[in-house]
Amino acid sequence: MFAAHLTNYAEDGHPTEQHAAYYEARARGGAGLIITEEHSVHPTDWPYEKLIHGFDESVIPGYRRITEAVHRHGTPIFAQINHNGGQASGMYSRLPVWAASPVADPMFREVAKEVDHAEIAEIVAGYALTAGHCVRGGFDGIELQCSHSSIVRGFLSPATNLRDDEYGGDLRRRARILLEIVAAVRDAIGPRRALGVRLCGDELIAGGTTIDEAVEVARLVESAGQVDYINTSIGVATSTLYMIEASMHIPPGYALFIPSAIRKAVELPVVGVGRFKDPLQAERALAEGHCDLIGVVRGQIADADFAAKARSGHGDDIRLCLSCNQECVGRMGLNRWLGCVENPRTGRESVALASPARARRRVMVVGAGPAGLQAAIAAAGRGHQVTVHERGDTPGGQVRLAAIVPSRAEFGDLIRNQLAECARLGITITCGSGVDAAAVRAAAPDAVIVATGAVAERPYWAPAEAAQVVDVRQVLDGSAAPAGRVLVVDEIGFHHATSVAELLADRGAQVEVVTPGMVVGQDLGITLDMENWCVRAAAKGIVQTTDCLVTGVAPGSVTLMHHPTGRSWQVAADWVVCAVPAAPAEQLYLDLKALGPGAGPEVHRAGDCVAPRRAHAAVIEGQRAGEAL
């Protein structure tokens, strides 16, 4: 099952051709059931720009494009409908947000308007209206989002429902709006279409819904006799989002206790979710009786053919999700359309695939990091004969180093997946072979793609004779072994500094991380890693110092400056580990370009040797370079 998740593909409140292509790719790839992203049921619900306005009749033609595309492959598709309630802002709607009680959401920090009885009736009618639009648009069923971000969740939760009328108080009264919505939607869609409810099993907040109450809600839903299945979730999107879309720091199947408990209490089919990245994990959850269906979202974002490969016994060919959250969850939080670090097709399904090359060419790729390997895959996919040359002993580039950190080991699946694809395409990879311009000319390929990565830059404040100043890469590759008092300098704001800080703390070092930013590893918030990093850092005694620049280093000490005030002081440090921007390793590319037209092969470059960035840029750029040949 391809469960509901945000995509940010909507335009002006309407579904797009990209929606149709995106969902069709998963239907073609064997998904047994698709549930779309949420569709808003009322004008007061517009928490983010690219939300589908299901309450507006003009969405129906777009719905039909989606359902027709999916039905071509025999796959049923449901629409999820929702009102986010107080977990929102009036920024886009220019209206007050509606909720059970006037409680300010911890993320949006906007006090909601407590809905009166007439407004509750308006919301219920909005669900029915939107469900009717979905039926007219060809959807096979409706899922009511009542879990991690929903006005219904707000009513169900004792933490956000402070009412003392018939919609507040005990659980049955708090569930009244849910049962009214169920009845109204069932009446709107008729008896032949499916109706599901997605419930939050544990909000993980003080005074919130717990698993025991969630089980009772499931019983109430079943007793209504109008619902066909129950889907599950964990956490609250604006308080404990890091538990809903868990990164690699949280084990697969972590939320299975929720469907397991609900399944014991009801006869309805129950859906389980929670970082299922491998078919074997899903099969085990089913075999052990935790649930009746498995929702796999990021796994099918990473590989649209996940289900078909699993069904045909080719599970080893699946491009496993990294659970890195960089291009899926991370892009959503930045109001960008959904993508994937390792699947350059995600978000571009509506763009035509590259056609086979007119003539087979001999292509040399220099560098076997994510950019070089993806370039090789793309070029070979067009029919070219491809060889990859890697200077080091092992493919992987900076990803291989990042995966050395135990808590980041799954990131190495990016390279494992690429190497498996290279093997299937017959790409030759030679390691331990440094290549210069003369070697390229001697090999005489028709085209060369330079993907030589980046090199560490030494900060201006670190003189060459300061032997105790090293780069994070030297720590990861083992060429430097800092110990004692270690100062880690974070000028990148991502996993570079935090991963090495943890690694050194685990080895017994006394670690302090200093950053010019307001928080250490500031972009960890985008990938939902910040909360877990802070917990682990505190447990390991890692000191975090913010708003500070390093201005000098001397034996045994480092000078810091608090940039808001200009105050300077010295801290003791035996070693300084730098996580600072790198420089492109572009010499080979420049040498080849300097040969001039006709004096050498066609030359392209990709990845960090263009400009040092993160893995997603390397993969996308590698794909483009390979497709250009």
Tell where the protein language model's regions lie, with residue ranges:
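Rossmann-like dinucleotide/flavin-binding elements
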Residues: 361-389, 395, 430-444, 451-525, ...
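SH3/SH3-like beta-barrel fold
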Residues: 558-562
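Conserved acidic residues
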Residues: 32, 140, 228, 292, ...
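Flavin-dependent oxidoreductase catalytic cores
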Residues: 1-366, 370, 375-381, 385-386, ...
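Short beta-alpha connecting loops at secondary-structure transitions
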Residues: 242-248, 292, 399-407, 522, ...
